[in-house]
């Protein structure tokens, strides 16, 4: 009975909001990836084509991630300002990518004229795109000044969506290879890294705050309003919510005051969801409309992967609440997402096609290896 009462904490605003946000972002990332791939295919524009991982690249991701973890564990204070600057640039680009379709939709709905403004880096920019780019840059500047958790989450979500659109999995075989390797990676760095490095490397890196280069520059130039600029920043590599979401918790006081979920725990499952969403669309050839996904949902693998993600996420949070210790989310998310997809595709005799991926008959597509 005591355990049940403990688990009721998951119904509190912070964990409930985290769960809803993560599930929504994961699905939105997969759906955006599908539309992006179709847009590139329709326009025959492969200059911004996504990267399709092969087996060697999939195996290298956990290795490179481990090296990055150790680098940030030992040298974070030395490279934090550089990381912040790089993250700020990536955030502007990701935010622009995420919001561009909405800007186009609003322009169409309002019947606005949108003349070309200029050309930059072989790309034509319209007036609305220019305004959107300025708005994205101002959002990142606001984050650099305030460090507010809402802006941190906004930038993190945009990075997740952009990553899933531009880094693709060609088939379930490569997907399973990647997920299993990251499954082991997550378990090792959360549960066993303390035995080798004297501290929980994953937790230490996840809770570190970066030095703010804007504060450093303002301080060196003795600019007015220095007290308004936050000295430390949470990098948008995770989404965070105050544990007392409705209680007026001051952002950035302590990492322990926040619930957090790494972007990888959304982006990696979203890559699987993007793969099965593309497979569903290829099999049914439905119109790419988010509301049309409800039709014939019993024939779509996305409706096994997405609930599986939600169940795995709830299980991870429940384990954390019961054990009062950090949990490797992929320990729960990998079986709960990959398992149902493989089992149902085996039952429906689609596993062979999913396992190897679609045959590319178009030579242009083959040369560019465009997969959604």
From Swiss-Prot:
Keywords: Endosome, Hydrolase, Membrane, Protease, Transmembrane, Transmembrane helix. Ubiquitous. GO terms for biological process: proteolysis. It is found in: Endosome membrane. The chain crosses the membrane at residues 7-27, 55-77, 82-104, 124-146, 150-167, 172-192, 258-278, 302-322, 326-346. Residues 28-54, 105-123, 168-171, 279-301, 347-372 are cytoplasmic. It comes from the Eukaryota. The keyword Membrane applies. This is Signal peptide peptidase-like 1.
């Amino acid at each position: 009975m005591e355990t049940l009462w403990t688990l009721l904490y998951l119904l509190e605003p912070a964990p409930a909001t985290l769960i809803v946000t993560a599930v929504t972002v994961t699905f939105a990332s997969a759906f955006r990836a599908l539309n992006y791939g179709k847009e590139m295919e329709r326009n025959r524009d492969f200059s911004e084509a996504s990267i399709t991982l092969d087996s060697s690249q999939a195996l290298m991701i956990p290795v490179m991630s481990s090296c990055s973890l150790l680098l940030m564990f030992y040298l974070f204070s030395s490279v934090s300002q550089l990381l912040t600057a790089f993250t700020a640039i990536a955030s502007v680009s990701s935010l622009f990518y995420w919001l561009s379709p909405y800007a186009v939709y609003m322009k169409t709905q309002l019947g606005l004229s949108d003349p070309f403004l200029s050309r930059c880096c072989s790309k034509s920019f319209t007036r609305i795109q220019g305004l959107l780019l300025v708005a994205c840059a101002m959002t990142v500047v606001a984050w650099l000044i305030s460090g507010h958790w809402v802006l941190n989450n906004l930038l993190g979500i945009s990075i997740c969506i952009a990553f899933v659109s531009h880094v693709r999995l060609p088939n379930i075989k490569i997907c399973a290879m990647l997920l299993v390797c990251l499954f082991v990676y997550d378990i090792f760095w959360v549960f066993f890294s303390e035995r080798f490095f004297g501290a929980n490397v994953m937790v230490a890196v996840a809770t570190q705050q970066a030095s703010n280069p804007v504060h450093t520059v303002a301080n060196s130039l003795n600019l007015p309003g220095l007290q308004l600029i936050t000295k430390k920043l949470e990098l948008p590599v995770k989404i965070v919510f105050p544990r007392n979401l409705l209680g007026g918790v001051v952002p950035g006081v302590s990492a322990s005051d926040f619930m957090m979920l790494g972007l990888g725990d959304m982006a990696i499952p979203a890559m699987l969801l993007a793969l099965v969403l593309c497979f569903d669309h290829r099999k049914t050839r439905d119109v790419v409309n988010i509301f049309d996904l409800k039709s014939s949902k019993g024939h779509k693998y996305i409706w096994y992967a997405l609930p599986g993600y939600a169940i795995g996420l709830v299980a991870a949070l429940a384990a954390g609440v019961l054990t009062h210790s950090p949990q490797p989310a992929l320990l729960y998310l990998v079986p709960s997402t990959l398992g149902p997809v493989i089992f149902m595709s085996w039952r429906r005799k689609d596993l062979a096609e999913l396992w190897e991926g679609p045959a590319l008959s178009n030579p242009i597509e083959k040369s560019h290896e465009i997969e959604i």
